[in-house]
Each structure stands twice: as structure tokens, then as C-alpha cells.
Amino acid sequence: MSDVVGDWDSFALLLIDVQKDFWTEVISIAFPDYGQNVASLLALCRNQGIDVVHLRAQFRKDQSDWLAHYRLGGDMPCVEETAGAEVFEYATESGGEPVIVKQTFDGFLSGELNEWLQANRKRYILVAGLVTSVCVLLTAAAAAQRGYLVSVVEDCCADKPEAHVHTLERYPFVFDVTAVDDIVTSRDDWLKKLAALET
């Protein structure tokens, strides 16, 4: 991991839903290094000065903010004050990093996330978290549709293996794919892309 802090003012990491209800047995078997990878990603971002925003699902016990499909089924992940809503220790916030609570697959839908990114002049978004084919994909797509450049950090996302691979391969017109060990070396190329958008 590099100790050289670069020009990361335009960048932010969105870490999505690293919560116990989304960590299934299938995913845990398929992605045994996931926790360490996320810990490494957060350490890199904090060391390099990349701002981190934590997005987390949380729903009321009375079902008043549940999505319609889940209300019909009578079951919802990440209900407040349940063990499933808890964040894994390796993914907790640090040093005043913002935490945005959401009740949607798309982390941008409430407007709070985009307001923060705009206020902090972010233009390039790194996306990681759970699960690849749902909240990671839909938040990455929402970012792209709002004019941000987006890279998904593939070794810090997880899902059923086939869904994970399909999602990362299917949408090159929405986002690029990177890995923790490639972030620092990719910075100059990403900055060139941002500069090209200004011309």
C-alpha cells in the first residue's frame, strides 16, 4: 500500500450495506477474503485522503418504510435494532465519515447522497459493498446517470458468484471495474478522464 498521498479531491468511496443480513452462507463461502479486502480498501482511502461515505439499509419495525414487495411478504432485511442490521466491525465508519441511512436499492434516491457529493465537489465515485447485483449496481448506475465517473471495486463487492460475475461484466457502459491494489496506480488515468470532460 502506498504511503504517498495523491490528488484525490474529486474522488469519494461509497461503501454500501456491509451488514449482517446481506452476508449469506453462499456469499461467505465464495468470498472468504472479503472482510480483509474491505478493511484494506478503507485503510487505503483513509491513508490517501479519499473521502468515504457509508450507505446503510435500515427499516422501521412497523413496516411504514418497507418497500411494497417486502410488506406483502412480511419480511425485511436490516430492520432497526436487529442483529441483521448491524455493520461488520471491519466496515465501521471512522473520524467523522458520513453515514447515510437508506430505504431503497439506489443510494441516490433520497437526494442526501448527491447533495453531499455536490457540496464536496466529487466527480469520480468508487463503489463497493453488498450486494453486487442489487444495491451496488443500482447505486453505481444512479451515479453514472447523474454525471459522475464510476469504478466498482470488484474485490470489495460480493454476491452469489454467478450474479457477481455477470454484473461486473455486463455494464461496461455504466462503470469501470477496479481492485484495491489498482486504485493508486489508476489515479492518473482517472484524472485524465476528468480533465477530458472539462474540455
Describe these PLM feature segments.
Residues 12-18:
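Acidic-leg catalytic submotif of subtilisin-like serine proteases
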Residues 18, 57-59, 155:
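Active-site loop/turn elements of alpha/beta-hydrolase fold enzymes
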Residues 26-32, 71-77:
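Short glycine-enriched, charge-decorated loop/helix-capping segments at active-site entrances
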Residues 1-12, 40-48, 72-199:
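Active-site-adjacent betaalpha module
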Residues 19-24:
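Short acidic, Gly/Ser-rich segments with clustered Asp/Glu that frequently serve as metal-coordination loops
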Residues 51-52, 56-75:
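Early exported N-terminus immediately downstream of N-terminal targeting peptides
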Residues 9, 27-58:
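A short alpha/beta connector and helix-capping loop motif
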